[in-house]
């Protein structure tokens, strides 16, 4: 039975610009029963905020799909801030590193599955599924990972352990139940997914929680239930009932597992006869050894490595049928929002083929049973069957979503800040580098930044070297730059440590750089993916967050793609200017905190201290997981000021404690992949340490 509060947006701002009309029209179309609705939202118009207000209007559980983990995290963060009293969850692949199992027949090379799982992301995945099965006020922000196989929601719910004060549950019986759903007993190291026993007290850290659960028995009855801090043991709150969901999504009861083992053995016998009949004795031997080992593991402990390859048997599905996915955890009336749909929709359609081609080899050469191919992502048709009403968000909607909506779309091009789309200027290629250098110097003098996009890696490298020779502060962003370094480069650009960023594909959706006033597109007339109309519009959008934003296209002719991009930009710009004039709006520069570019999902650990301060019987943590209180992004130092106090007047001991506190926050941010935030803490700590050394040198305390 799903419970939960109503969706409620908490924001210091009201809808503005095109937002009110867009929200009303989206709501009207969805309530009228339209299955597919497109929101054409220009860069910087507040599509995420529009989504939050739409969810509040419709009061329906919502899945928001984003094209990658970074944008999913950014979206989740924004929605958490606007929906602080609801469950905004984050569901992406939990692998930090993943090498899938594969066999290369040409070289007779078997590559064993190798992966590194991020425990925090795994917890957030469990948090999403447990929230979906227990409440309705849920928004899940997910990557394309949500179309991959997951255990069935019915098994996940059926195998959960419900606890209530006053009920009779023998302690040893509870321990057996916990082991059955893959919790491990560990009285020495208390970690997520484990439990420990101390006399009549059992303590568990559920797979989806940062807090532990304490169950106190009196005889065979449950006397009390508490949430507590797993490290200190301090009680956070007392509850009357709770539900412990399984530690893995692939879980089955003893009867279901026995049936699965029986059908696996039947399939194994059939496949071995087939392989041996074709003289493939080596393949048959491989398959027999591996499968029998896995069966024995499942028989003894209810689990085995790679159990997902047997998911068809465990779920009791027929051959060729689609697996259960995150979509199956939603109620039937859920709303789907696809962000950056021009990128995300093709991703969804392409996942199945890449997966099936790899698994065919594994089956053919005896590494897996044929049923392993049924542990797979959804095909496009299967995905379409599982979704209901869908809202597509994009500045450049793709052909699929436009065809689904009959070519109609809701438009959101007027920004709440009054900012207008940049001017587009076409310049000849002759003397383009000298012209570019002049433009760069003009902007560097007034503390503005420049993005330059080229067509090839060689051209980007040569241009970067030449600009350096000319005394320009420039950096080069390319595909080999890792995530941490990429975020650091963007941060340095915004801080003014250099003035120009050169790259090949700088149209990155979500690249949010308000300081950039010029985007230079070299070889704009060379038709291709990087110079298509859609790509050009996305690239133009990178200059749309600056009052004096301009785009310079260097080309000797105007291609059809250029004309389409320029015409669309001019159309939007004319509408924006007319709106500003009619309403007396003066465009305001976007002031976005530099630490906010790529802030990732806040973890539950962020508010554990605040939760601990709530007395037993109090309201405890906010019901929505992983959320800081509104307007409390964590303590930070800014220009020598901390929480309103001048750090130069702080006592030495207090300053040392502050450094220790910020160091701890830096480590948490780095662990959670909040690299920009971690770098900001690092710089602040360095400044404070200088101040501390100065105090020591002066003999001050």
UniProtKB/Swiss-Prot annotation:
Record key words, sorted: ATP-binding, Cytoplasm, DNA damage, DNA excision, DNA repair, Excision nuclease, Helicase, Hydrolase, Nucleotide-binding, SOS response
InterPro entries (UniProt xref): Helicase/UvrB_N, Helicase_ATP-bd, Helicase_C-like, P-loop_NTPase, UVR_dom, UVR_dom_sf, UvrB, UvrB_inter
Presence of the UniProt keyword RNA-binding in the record: no
UniProt-annotated stretches for the region Disordered: 606-636
Sequence positions that bind ATP: 41-48
Domain topic, free-text comment: The beta-hairpin motif is involved in DNA binding.
UniProt cross-references to SUPFAM superfamilies, sorted A to Z: C-terminal UvrC-binding domain of UvrB (SSF46600), P-loop containing nucleoside triphosphate hydrolases (SSF52540)
GO MF, any single term: DNA binding
A Pfam entry, by short name: ResIII
Protein name, UniProt field: UvrABC system protein B
Domain Helicase ATP-binding: 28-188
Localization per record: Cytoplasm
UniProt xrefs under CDD domains: DEXHc_UvrB (cd17916), SF2_C_UvrB (cd18790)
Subunit record text: Forms a heterotetramer with UvrA during the search for lesions. Interacts with UvrC in an incision complex.
Residues annotated as domain UVR: 656-691
Record-annotated Helicase C-terminal domain positions: 432-598
GO BP terms, alphabetized: nucleotide-excision repair; SOS response
Gene name in the database record: uvrB
Database matches in HAMAP family: UvrB
